[in-house]
């Protein structure tokens, strides 16, 4: 599909009028990811184009792929995998998994793609690109956007991959001296595959709420919700995640803590553990 940079001034004006008239939403393209309403302003051809462009950045010939729990995730995942395989990239399929798990795997094998629109509304979806365990730069984004004129490659292979995230995290965190009663608001997202088991492994007594997206009592973004159910059920500690589990809100002492406090606590703990 055409992007505004490729249009004349008159054509861009007509496009703005069309969007205003028909409430057309434009796909968001940034180093944080490609995001849009799948099937309305974000299409299969976009997925193929951006993944083709991203393949130019992959030097190891390997790419981890994970996704959150959105309804369109599996459809996009198959398209992403097929595109990578066609480009000669070996695909490590992590299935439904938190974004940090994909980042860690990408650091190990060289690249990763997360199919997510993070905390955006459920009808949205998108692609987050990772190189060597980090997000892409502005220069790399320009390469991702130019998914044309690619040489033919041998077909890559697909590997259903497990993650050592939980076992490695337990080694870093260690076991708790005193068991904690923890309530986790999954938010219907990917946290369900990691958070409960990890907390149990370090010695917590865990209760979960909103395990599935269907019937979830709140929206995708825990920072914009009062988290009333979580607050009422939390005894020692509570955690609320967004759909791809790269946002977390802490509940303690009968109330929801701000995201700034949550981040600060995480940074302090990381420094104490010597994590960089």
Give the ranges of each region predicted by the language model.
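Short beta-strand-to-turn element immediately C-terminal to the catalytic PLP-Schiff-base lysine
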Residues: 129-132, 249-253
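Gly/Ser/Thr-enriched, mixed-charge loops and adjacent short helices
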Residues: 123-233
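N-terminal small/polar loop signature for handling phosphorylated ligands or for N-terminal nucleophile
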Residues: 63-124, 197-251
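Proline/glycine-rich low-complexity loops and linkers
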Residues: 85, 142-167, 252-276
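An N-terminal, well-structured beta->alpha segment
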Residues: 22-88, 109, 156-182
């Amino acid at each position: 599909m055409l992007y505004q940079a490729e249009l004349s001034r008159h054509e861009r004006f007509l496009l703005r009028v069309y969007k205003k008239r028909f409430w057309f939403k434009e796909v968001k393209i940034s180093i944080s990811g490609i995001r849009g309403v799948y099937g309305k302003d974000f299409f299969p051809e976009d997925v193929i184009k951006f993944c083709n462009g991203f393949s130019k950045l992959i030097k190891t010939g390997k790419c981890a792929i994970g996704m959150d729990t959105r309804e369109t995730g599996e459809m996009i995942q198959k398209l992403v995998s097929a595109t990578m395989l066609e480009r000669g990239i070996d695909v490590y399929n992590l299935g439904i998994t938190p974004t940090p798990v994909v980042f860690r795997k990408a650091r190990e094998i060289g690249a990763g793609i997360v199919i997510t629109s993070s905390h955006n509304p459920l009808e949205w979806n998108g692609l987050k690109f990772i190189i060597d365990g980090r997000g892409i730069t502005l220069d790399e984004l320009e390469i991702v956007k130019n998914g044309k004129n690619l040489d033919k490659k041998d077909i890559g292979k697909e590997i259903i991959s497990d993650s050592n995230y939980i076992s490695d995290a337990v080694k870093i965190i260690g076991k708790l001296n005193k068991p904690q009663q923890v309530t986790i608001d999954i938010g219907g997202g990917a946290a369900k595959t990691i958070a409960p088991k990890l907390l149990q492994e370090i010695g917590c007594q865990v209760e979960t709420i909103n395990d599935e997206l269907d019937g979830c009592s709140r929206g995708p973004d825990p920072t914009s919700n009062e988290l009333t159910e979580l607050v009422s059920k939390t005894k020692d500690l509570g955690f609320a995640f967004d759909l791809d589990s790269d946002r977390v809100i802490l509940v303690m002492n009968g109330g929801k803590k701000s995201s700034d406090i949550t981040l600060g606590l995480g940074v302090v703990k990381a420094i104490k553990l010597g994590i960089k």
